[in-house]
């Protein structure tokens, strides 16, 4: 057994013993998030942006838009694409190069949470049906990784979309020309999906796992919900099995915690407009 494995084993035993006593390594309750700070509109050249600090985890999201063609199978819908970049400076486990499995999973779950909740109304992003639509790029940069990137990215992405202002577009049916105006308008964001992630350590579930907790967890479960009572994404990761009662508890808790986080997001958006 290597020294790293010995240290990991000691850390796991310590965390599990604390959990059995009703404590966490950073003194939070099992359902408590670390402090959440949200600042929007901080990238001048982006159409929308948000910096989210979840404890020491930091994520920056920028929104850019352009006009393009719709996908052939969805001619009456705009296009949304999500990309996650794990900056090597954020963690010694991040390496330069194309997106790895972690980045791909983070992007897919974030995209699914927004898309399946219909948070961004893609139908309202159509300029000319079947020909010209608005294309939205959600670009995520992880600046510091101290656990629970899934929630930090999801929160930052929806905050950046809410912050976005894009040029108005007019289509002249007679000439077939599209004019991009100087006047700007918000994106058609109609719901606020929020992911809530649980780590299973031993037989105990904790919300918003820190990096230390992630290193020893047996499984991970993310539940994304919106304010209408819908679940738009569920993602299980890191192996491990979840009992039905654990999943039901996670769903119930996810709705409750998402409501709290949604208020923080809306307060940040309101503050930016003052």
From Swiss-Prot:
Keywords: Cytoplasm, Exosome. It is found in: Cytoplasm. The keyword Cytoplasm applies. GO terms for biological process: rRNA catabolic process. Disulfide bonds: none annotated. CDD domains: RNase_PH_archRRP42 (cd11365). InterPro entries: ExoRNase_PH_dom1, ExoRNase_PH_dom2, ExoRNase_PH_dom2_sf, Exosome_comp_Rrp42_subfam, PNPase/RNase_PH_dom_sf, Ribosomal_Su5_D2-typ_SF, Rrp42_archaea. One of its GO terms (molecular function) is mRNA 3'-UTR AU-rich region binding. GO terms for cellular component: cytoplasmic exosome (RNase complex). Non-catalytic component of the exosome, which is a complex involved in RNA degradation. Contributes to the structuring of the Rrp41 active site. Component of the archaeal exosome complex. Forms a hexameric ring-like arrangement composed of 3 Rrp41-Rrp42 heterodimers. The hexameric ring associates with a trimer of Rrp4 and/or Csl4 subunits. Belongs to the RNase PH family. Rrp42 subfamily. This is Exosome complex component Rrp42. It comes from Pyrococcus horikoshii (strain ATCC 700860 / DSM 12428 / JCM 9974 / NBRC 100139 / OT-3).
